[in-house]
Amino acid sequence: MKPVFKTSDLAIDKTGSVLVTEQLQKLIDLAAQNQGIALVEKGTYLTASLFLKSHMELRLEEGAELLGTTDESCYPVIPTRAAGIEMDWYPGIVNINNQTDVTVSGKGTINGQGEYWWNKYWGTDQTGGYRKEYDAKGLRWACDYDCRRVRNLVVMESDHITLKDFTSTRSGFWNVHVCYSSHVHVDGIHITACGSNSPSPDGSDIDSCE
């Protein structure tokens, strides 16, 4: 039986009022070192980007919510691929990059707090934000790339990945992005964009995979 490492083991704040990225990453690293399960228990966990490792499972208990912070300074800018272009951009809230044998499961939720990112793109009334500035310059095509937003879950250059049962909602950009990967099993995940003011809240984007 795989060892289980719980958020309560590390006394990680679950009120959603304190940023707990470092503590959650420590839990993930501990699970990976032991080829075990990082169990996020019921509660709300305010976080920036988390990076999963090979031979582990991230399990979101029912009632558990990973709540993406809207403080952009908390997100690193890394080489990635967004909307078909290689560029430096924000990673996801949950990331599986260059890993193998990783599972994300459970009845919990990844919540991107999309309203912040949507308003960044085109304001509260779809006539402002980056879009207004870029439209005025005749650069509509570039707005999607220059207006960095956060995806909820990114799988990049990885293999033998399972995504099962969790909910992805209110993503700042695409909800689930699987890119340059193989043997990815997606089963029973629930995706909601929420809101007519949400630009590019695609559900699941399978990009250059086999």
Residue ranges with predicted function:
Residues 1-210:
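Extracellular/periplasmic carbohydrate-active domains that bind, remodel
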